[in-house]
Amino acid sequence: MVHPPPPPPRLLLVALVGLLSLREVVAEPAEEAGTPCPEGLWPVPPQVLPRVTYTQVSQGQAEGIAFFYHPCAHPWLKLQLALLAHLYVAKPTLIPDFSLTWDRPLVLTAWGTALELAWIEPAWVAHWLKRQRRRKQRKSVWFLSDNLFGPTPTMPASRRGKLCGRRCVQAPTLAFALRSWRPPGAQVTSRGSGRSSISVVKRRGLRAALGLQSTPPGLRVSLASSQSLKAQQLTLGTSSVAPVSLTTGGPGGNGRSRTEAQMPSGQGNHGGCACPGQVSPAPRAAGPPRVARGPTPRTEEAAWAAMALTFLLVLLTLATLCTRLHRNFRRSESIYWGPTADSQDTVAALLKRRLPLPSRRIKRSRRRPLLPPTPDSGPDSESSD
């Protein structure tokens, strides 16, 4: 009997453990090993929105990124925090802290601010780190104008909070894949409207937690669907889909150019980690090709309507041209209005000239004979008459 292959999350976990050498990370520090939890390990807390606070940190930690966790937190959360630390920071700092609470046992501090988490959300963490990094750079412009492209002389390069190091291999893809991991006993919500509503709530919650500040379209957090998550888990070595672009922030001469990496506007691809000597990630895999649809009744009706309108427009144009030509055509002289020398005839003259005159009746006298006299008739005949 052939056993089914393990699910994608397990394969991904094994690959990450072997890739990132987590034996150094998962091992508990000496200070944590001797502090047992009186009530045992805490269960996994419910998933709540992250909270951003301002902290007072030492001078050594002011310019770096540190990851705090409660020693009694669930081991699954510790493992996720360790993976996240190695993905985003070259030399992560994992510090146990007993002052954390059960509802938010994980805290990420960077440049004087802290992000308290209940679960590991790589998309939110990456977006928050990106914003904090840019705020820090905007502040440093006013005070360190001469050293914009390098570290300050008083601060070592390792404390600059470098977000990408030697182990940055497809970091955005791995970090985004962490979002699909569920702790033991957690139920995965079904696909459909429920998942879409949860994603909308998470987007709104992220904006509320981060201060309701507008971000450029290239930095907005995009929550992928379950199908894209499975595809990213299966194609770990080739895919490079990420919710946000991680910055390098290195101390080199081109550190600012790597930090301010621009997104290609045409493809909407959020690039991977821009490490030195690393091949640029492949563009985002396009969706299934759209099948060409045939003409529908509505499109045919629209085509006929367009043809009819075109015909009417042509007909109207021809009629207008014909009217213009007819008006400009020189007609012959009228039989009623003849040409005049001075064109100053009066109405009476026109009527007298044009109206037909009545025929005169000739009056005949009674004494004149109707017939002319004959030569035979003489004066006798006249006297007899």
From Swiss-Prot:
Give UniProt keywords alphabetically: Cell membrane, Cytoplasm, Membrane, Signal, Transmembrane, Transmembrane helix
* Membrane topology per record: Single-pass type I membrane protein
- List all Low complexity biased stretches: 281-297
Q: Where is this region: Disordered?
A: 242-297, 359-385
Got a GO cellular component term for this one? plasma membrane
Ranges of the Extracellular topological domain: 28-301
For this UniProt entry, which residues form the secretion signal? 1-27
Residues spanning the membrane: 302-322
Q: What is its main location?
A: membrane
Q: Tell me, which GO biological process terms does this entry list?
A: negative regulation of cell cycle; response to UV; response to xenobiotic stimulus
Where are the compositionally biased (Basic residues) regions? 359-369
Q: What does this protein do?
A: May act as a tumor suppressor. Inhibits tumor cell growth, when overexpressed.
Question: This protein is called what?
Answer: Tumor protein p53-inducible protein 13
Organism annotation: Mus musculus (Mouse)
Underlying gene:
Tp53i13
